[in-house]
Each structure stands twice: as structure tokens, then as C-alpha cells.
């Protein structure tokens, strides 16, 4: 990453690092479009009222002000001010409502775009970063099968990135109805508060979460222990999940004919369906993990977190869930389900831990040498002929000594240097009898015609390696 007068949390990739990021973006887009998702881009700003709908605190929102407004921001309510979007879900919900008449539903969209979040920067966490999202939005209703399909699409995309050093990814799924029903069955009423504290489990540990449950959510010690017992449940198939959950309900006196159990069972059935159907298509890719809470209060059903094997310190790299109430227009609701990858964080891991790197900085496969400036038009004609045939080509920036031009190509990783035959009299070195091209990696130099010469496809390709 570029150093110098940097601003904490605002990364700038070096050219070679940008190649890796672009390859990740291209890979994700390819997989998303193979699965029928449509790309969109939304504006960078939303109103404060829209941004606060998701339950974020205003401390994490970057608000915009013109210079002449500095010092007078308090005159305008935060709901009426403009701020940079901190995710892509809030802009999507607004976009769908505004353009509903022009969209076909269910609307399957992918979006890869920068977002801004005013949180404390740390290793792998940024204030400005790229997110990669897929969502499906329905008009009025949305079938449950999308709650299986979306995590499988993300797993498929992450599997493609294993070629660049990414470990195997596993989606951990839960359902908010299951958790809410269980908490209500215990007699707890601050369900949102309990979910927010359970969401901190991996960060602060069970003892601290238990303390917060009793101090902030009104739970007794027994209720707090029961919440933690639920969070410990995992299962790889629906039958195992149902058996473990029913045993826990019985142990804590949650009867099966209660409203709380009925609500929990709705979530359990959906979660079991997700795990079983995912296992039939891609075994081991999705497991039930009842500690997954997603502390944001707009999720209404399935919730997901995605973890990489052997990278526990990285935490979740892809998360999301089902939301039924985020977007509406009059009496019509637009329920959705979506997943989001913190792409910048993922790229940072790939660069600095997995060792992903570009084989060269420049996309050009050929550098056309310039004997002297009078011959630059001829060099440009050769370059244009090669480009017209799909061969990425650059032209030497100056008519420097030939050795310097070759060193320039080498520094950029350009594998071929083209020597034009139309050298002017007095150029350094012997003038070639015709055009020649040199592979500066192997040293091989051969006669070449820009209308027919083909580079070695492996040598010419700009790639990401590990």
C-alpha cells in the first residue's frame, strides 16, 4: 500500500496491488452475472433520514458540507443533510422504490462500489472501502428459496478466488425468528438488545456478554446462560438442528404450543431448509450456527456470516440476511435478501497474508522501442497495428539509449520489446534488417511482422499469482 502523507483508514493501492483488486472484482462480477444478477451503481450520497433507517448511529456517517456552511451545520437537522452511504443496502432500498416501475421483480442485482464508514480504523478495517453486494428484492413477497441460493452464489464466487490464495469459505447461518422466539420463550422482552449483545460474542467472550445481558437487557443469570447455550448450537443438517433445539427448549421450559415456540419453529424450519438444500448442492458450504445474530435491527429472517478456514482473526468476510421491512411504497413492501463482501478487507488479506501478487505492473505485453524522436510516428503505427489485433502495447516514452528502454520495460514487467526497422541514420547500435521483437525474459530475439506476429499467450498475459 502506498505510504507517505496517508490518512488513516483511507487505503490507496499501489499499481501492482490494484491489479489484484481488479482481478477480484472481475471474478466476482463474472460469477454474479453467471447467476443472472444485474449490475447497478447508485449515487454516493443519501439523505440523513435514509441513512439512519438502518439503525446505524450518526457517529459512523460522514456528512457533507460546503465550505461556506462550516460552523452552521447544526442549523439543519441531520435527517435533512446529505451523507456518504456507509453500505449498499440502504441505497438499494431507495433505488428500488424510486425505480420500481422500470424494474422486473424479483430484482436480482449486483453492486461493487465504494462506501464510507466513520469507525475506528484498524488492520484490515477501513473508513473508505469497496463492498461487493448481491441482493434479490421482491415486490410484495419473496420466496424462501432465495435464502438458499444467495449464500451458494457467494460461496461459488469465493471458491473462484481460491486460485489467488483465499482459503475455503463456509457460511454460518441463523434465523432471527428462531432466536427471537427462544428469547421470548425465556421471558425476555428486549429482543433487539439481546441480539446486539450476542453479536459481540466472538469479540468480547461469553462472560462479558452474560454480564451485558443482565445489566442492559434485564436478563437473569439463568436467562443469560440459556441465551449463551443457544449460541453454542451448531449443526450441519436440519434433523440434527431440530433435535438440538427442541432439547434446549425442553430444558428451559419452552413448551411447543406456545406463541414463542411457534415463532422459533418458523425460523428453525427455514434454517433447516437452507442447510439441507445447500448440502445437496455444495456439501459443507453452509452450516447452522445459532450465535450468528447480525446486530442490525432491520433483519427479519435468515442471517449469515462467512468465515475462512484458518483465518479466525480475520472474522467474517461476507455477511447479510433477509429483510422484509426496509423498503416500502404505500402499502406495498419490497422484501429482500442479500449478502455483502468487504472487498477491500478481503484484498488486504490476499495481498499481505495469502501472498497474492501481479506478475507485472503494466497490462502491456509489448513495448515498441524508439530509435529517435523522428521515428516516433513509425513506432506509433506499429503499436496501433498490434493494438488493433488485441495485443496490449506501449511505446517507449523517450528515445533513450536502448538499454534504458529495455530496463524501463523490465521495471513494468513488459515481456517483449519491439525494435522497428525504420531506424534513422545515426541511431545507436546496428540497424535491424527488418522489425524484430525480443523476449527480455528469455533473451530470444526474432524477426517479426506487426500484422501477423503473436506473443506467447502465457508470457503476454497479466495475471495474479501466489
From Swiss-Prot:
InterPro entries: aa-tRNA-synth_II (IPR006195), aa-tRNA-synth_II/BPL/LPL (IPR045864), Anticodon-bd (IPR004154), Anticodon-bd_dom_sf (IPR036621), His-tRNA-ligase (IPR015807), HisRS-like_core (IPR041715), HisRS/HisZ (IPR004516). GO terms for molecular function: ATP binding; histidine-tRNA ligase activity. Transmembrane segments: none annotated. Its EC number is 6.1.1.21. It holds the Pfam family HGTP_anticodon. One of its GO terms (cellular component) is cytoplasm. GO terms for biological process: histidyl-tRNA aminoacylation. Keywords: Aminoacyl-tRNA synthetase, ATP-binding, Cytoplasm, Ligase, Nucleotide-binding, Protein biosynthesis. It comes from the Bacteria. It is found in: Cytoplasm. It catalyses: tRNA(His) + L-histidine + ATP = L-histidyl-tRNA(His) + AMP + diphosphate + H(+). NCBIfam families: hisS. Belongs to the class-II aminoacyl-tRNA synthetase family. Homodimer. This is Histidine--tRNA ligase. It comes from Bifidobacterium longum (strain NCC 2705). The lineage of its organism: Bacteria, Bacillati, Actinomycetota, Actinomycetes, Bifidobacteriales. The gene is hisS.
Amino acid at each position: 500500500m502506498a505510504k507517505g502523507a496517508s490518512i488513516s483508514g483511507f487505503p490507496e493501492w499501489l499499481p501492482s496491488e490494484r491489479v489484484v483488486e481488479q482481478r477480484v472484482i472481475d471474478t466476482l462480477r463474472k460469477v454474479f452475472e453467471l447467476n443472472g444478477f444485474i449490475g447497478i451503481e447508485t449515487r454516493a450520497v443519501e439523505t440523513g433520514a435514509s441513512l439512519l433507517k438502518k439503525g446505524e448511529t450518526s457517529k459512523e456517517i460522514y456528512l457533507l458540507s460546503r465550505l461556506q456552511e462550516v460552523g452552521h451545520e447544526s442549523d439543519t437537522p441531520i435527517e435533512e443533510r446529505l451523507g456518504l452511504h456507509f453500505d449498499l443496502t440502504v441505497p438499494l432500498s431507495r433505488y428500488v422504490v424510486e425505480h420500481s416501475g422500470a424494474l422486473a421483480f424479483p430484482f436480482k442485482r449486483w453492486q461493487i462500489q465504494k462506501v464510507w464508514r466513520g469507525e475506528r480504523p484498524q488492520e484490515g478495517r477501513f473508513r473508505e472501502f469497496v463492498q461487493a453486494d448481491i441482493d434479490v428484492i421482491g415486490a410484495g413477497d419473496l420466496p424462501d428459496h432465495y435464502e438458499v441460493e444467495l449464500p451458494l452464489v457467494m460461496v461459488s464466487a469465493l471458491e473462484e478466488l481460491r486460485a489467488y490464495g483465499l482459503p475455503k469459505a463456509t457460511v454460518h447461518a441463523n434465523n432471527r425468528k428462531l432466536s427471537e422466539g427462544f428469547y421470548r420463550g425465556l421471558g425476555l422482552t428486549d429482543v433487539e438488545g439481546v441480539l446486539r449483545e450476542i453479536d459481540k460474542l466472538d469479540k468480547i467472550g461469553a462472560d462479558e456478554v452474560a454480564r451485558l445481558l443482565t445489566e442492559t437487557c434485564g436478563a437473569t443469570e439463568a436467562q443469560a446462560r440459556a441465551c449463551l447455550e443457544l449460541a453454542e448450537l451448531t449443526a450441519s443438517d436440519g434433523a440434527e438442528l431440530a433435535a438440538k433445539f427442541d432439547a434446549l427448549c425442553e430444558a428451559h421450559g419452552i413448551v411447543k404450543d406456545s406463541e414463542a415456540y411457534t415463532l422459533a419453529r418458523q425460523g428453525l424450519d427455514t434454517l433447516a431448509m437452507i442447510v439441507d438444500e445447500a448440502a445437496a448442492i455444495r456439501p459443507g458450504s453452509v452450516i447452522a450456527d445459532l450465535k450468528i445474530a447480525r446486530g442490525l435491527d432491520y433483519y427479519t429472517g435468515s442471517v449469515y456470516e462467512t468465515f475462512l478456514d484458518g483465518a479466525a482473526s480475520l472474522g467474517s468476510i461476507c455477511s447479510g440476511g433477509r429483510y422484509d421491512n426496509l423498503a416500502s411504497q404505500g402499502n406495498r413492501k419490497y422484501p429482500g435478501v442479500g449478502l455483502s463482501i468487504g472487498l477491500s478487507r478481503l484484498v488486504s488479506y490476499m495481498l499481505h497474508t495469502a501472498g497474492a501478487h501481479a506478475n507485472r505492473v503494466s497490462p502491456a505485453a509489448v513495448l515498441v522501442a524508439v530509435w529517435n524522436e523522428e521515428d516516433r510516428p513509425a513506432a506509433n503505427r506499429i503499436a496501433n497495428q498490434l493494438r488493433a489485433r488485441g495485443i496490449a502495447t506501449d511505446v517507449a516514452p523517450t528515445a533513450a539509449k536502448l538499454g534504458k528502454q529495455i530496463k524501463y520495460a523490465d521495471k513494468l514487467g513488459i515481456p517483449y520489446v519491439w525494435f522497428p526497422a525504420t531506424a534513422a541514420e545515426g541511431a545507436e547500435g546496428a540497424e535491424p534488417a527488418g522489425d524484430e521483437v525480443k523476449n527480455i525474459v528469455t533473451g530470444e530475439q526474432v524477426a517479426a511482422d506487426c500484422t501477423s506476429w503473436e506473443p506467447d499467450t502465457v508470457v503476454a498475459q497479466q495475471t495474479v499469482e501466489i
